[in-house]
């Protein structure tokens, strides 16, 4: 049986993640407050950020940027798309 959480992004009860996505306090918070659907939405947004900003995830500052954007996406004012970004349809 899957677990449910009150998702901070979707503002409703939804299926929760199966395991903590990464270690640490932020990982625990995501596990407890973010649904599987919202996590998948973040993964798509994160991929767009990596590609548009040409982030090199070997660099600590790129990983820190993504961590900050994730906090904004789920728990803050929201993560913005890069200026000039146009979605492919």
From Swiss-Prot:
InterPro entries: Fe_traffick_prot_YggX (IPR007457), Fe_traffick_prot_YggX_sf (IPR036766)
Any Gene Ontology biological process: cellular response to oxidative stress
SUPFAM superfamilies hit by this protein: YggX-like
TM region(s), chain numbering: none
Cross-referenced Pfam families: Iron_traffic
Highest rank taxon of the organism: Bacteria
GO cellular component term, pick one: cytosol
Keywords recorded for this protein, A-Z: Iron
GO molecular function: iron ion binding
Family, similarity comment: Belongs to the Fe(2+)-trafficking protein family.
Function, in words: Could be a mediator in iron transactions between iron acquisition and iron-requiring processes, such as synthesis and/or repair of Fe-S clusters in biosynthetic enzymes.
Name recorded for this polypeptide: Probable Fe(2+)-trafficking protein
């Amino acid at each position: 049986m899957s677990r449910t959480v009150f998702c901070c992004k979707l503002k409703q009860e939804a299926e929760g993640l199966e395991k903590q996505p990464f270690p640490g306090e932020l990982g625990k918070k995501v596990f407890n407050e973010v649904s599987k659907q919202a996590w998948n939405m973040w993964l798509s947004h994160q991929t767009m950020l990596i590609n548009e900003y040409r982030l090199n995830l070997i660099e600590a500052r790129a990983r820190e940027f993504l961590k900050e954007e994730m906090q904004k996406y789920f728990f803050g004012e929201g993560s913005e798309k890069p200026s000039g970004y146009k979605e492919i349809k």
